[in-house]
Regions:
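Active-site acidic-Proline motif in GNAT/NAT acetyltransferases
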Residues: 87-93, 121-122
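Extreme N-terminal starter segment of soluble prokaryotic enzymes
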Residues: 1-3
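Short coil/turn segments at alpha/beta junctions that flank glycine-rich nucleotide-binding fingerprints
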Residues: 93, 109-113
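Acetyl-CoA-dependent GNAT
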Residues: 5-82, 87-89, 100-102, 106, ...
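C-terminal "cap" of GNAT-fold acetyltransferases
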Residues: 20, 113-116, 120-158
């Protein structure tokens, strides 16, 4: 298994994988990451200062990823942990922890002091992982994510 930064040539394979995982998880197609236009161009979306997307690769295939970027329409120091999804074949191996650590370290290096995340009620394993890393539930959405169907909001001080 290898963790690396996303490359332009990853876009097609990554978009297909992310949509497959979202369908498997029963995520609505409207008001979630499923309909994000940037899902088809992850490289371009995260190819800017203060943004980074990491890929998990195993046997020369993309098995998941996670990104960090400034939260749209929020203060300069607030970032969002974004599009953290993994193929079922690699879940339960501690990869989520590795990816959160990579993303949060990048956020700290880039002077963010709060990290926000949205998730779905049925993604209990993900919520437990976020809690383990110090995220706390909040009662309101932040920023302009376009994810009106995501009713679980969490925040962490960095």
């Amino acid at each position: 298994m290898k963790i690396r930064e996303v490359k332009k040539t990853d876009n097609f394979e990554l978009a297909a994988l992310l949509r497959k995982i979202l369908i498997e998880m029963g995520v609505p197609k409207k008001g979630t990451a499923f309909e994000d236009s940037e899902i088809d161009c992850i490289y371009e979306t995260y190819n800017s200062p203060r943004s980074k997307y990491f890929i998990v690769e195993e046997d020369a295939k993309i098995k998941g990823g996670a990104g960090i970027s400034q939260l749209k329409n929020e203060a300069y120091e607030i970032c969002e942990l974004q599009k953290m999804y993994f193929d079922s074949s690699i879940r339960g191996r501690g990869i989520g922890s590795l990816m959160i650590e990579k993303c949060l370290n990048f956020a700290k290096e880039n002077k963010f002091n709060l990290c926000y995340i949205e998730t779905m009620p049925n993604m209990l394993d993900a919520q437990m992982l976020y809690l383990k890393y110090g995220f706390e539930y909040i009662n309101y959405p932040m920023g302009d994510t376009g994810h009106s169907a995501c009713p679980i909001w969490m925040i962490k001080s960095l």
